[in-house]
Amino acid sequence: MIDFTFEATAFLTNIVCYFYEIKAFMSKYFLISSAFLLLILGCSSSRDLSDLSVDERLASAIKLFEDEDFEDASIEFEALLLQYPGSSIVDDAQYYLGRCKFEREEFILSAFEFSKLIKNMPASEFVADAQFMLAESYYELSPDYTLDQKYSKKAIEEYQAFVDFFPLNERVAEAERKISELNDKLAQKEYSIAVIYEKMDYYTASLKYYDAVVEIYHDTQYAPMSMYRKIKLLMDREREDEALKEMTKFVRMYPEDKNFNEIEGLKNSLEAKLKGGFSSN
């Protein structure tokens, strides 16, 4: 019993000593790590900005941006916005902060920063550029046509606002081109849904989506494709009167389409048939 007590006491003593050794090691490790971290932070903020004017600090931050040091530039612009909220350089800082977020591919954040400038500083010289970059942010967020297209729609909305408010801006042509590109993507999504419904024999739903493409996205490549498939579907369903109406619209609206000759031939044949009183409707 005595030996057991002695051994147990020795064991517990060793455990306690080991615990204090670990504690001492961790304390030393924490102090070393803290010192190392402070050293890094000290080096990263070694530039003394305390004697610089607001304009000089802005110039320094812009220089960081131009040198593509977007992380440090972003920190500087945020600091300027916090420290000098009523200064004349606020819109500069706000705009470049948005640009930093955009260059870092933080597109949701860049959209937020550009929106703040447009909303809070409507008289700023940066509003036109901010409006374009807001649209660009949503454009970058626009996914493949198979996915949800909310950002595509937001991008179209913001590009259109840019075109409407700044019609003489040199970037209007680019904005219009991207509106067309995004509309094409939206049309492709609707068209693909129509095709899926058609393959599943949900003809009413399919026709509805084909009509939507023609009506809403009439200036995209998917409009004549949708009308063509609608005509073929109506003919397959023996709805000849309706098919003829669509054929008439097709040859009037899409004379340059690759399917024009086929549809014109079908139209002529169907007209002759219906005039002879052989309509199946």
Place the predicted regions along the sequence by residue.
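Sec-dependent bacterial lipoprotein signal peptides
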Residues: 3-43
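Acidic, polar-rich low-complexity tracts and alpha-helical solenoid repeat scaffolds
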Residues: 13-14, 31-32, 42-281
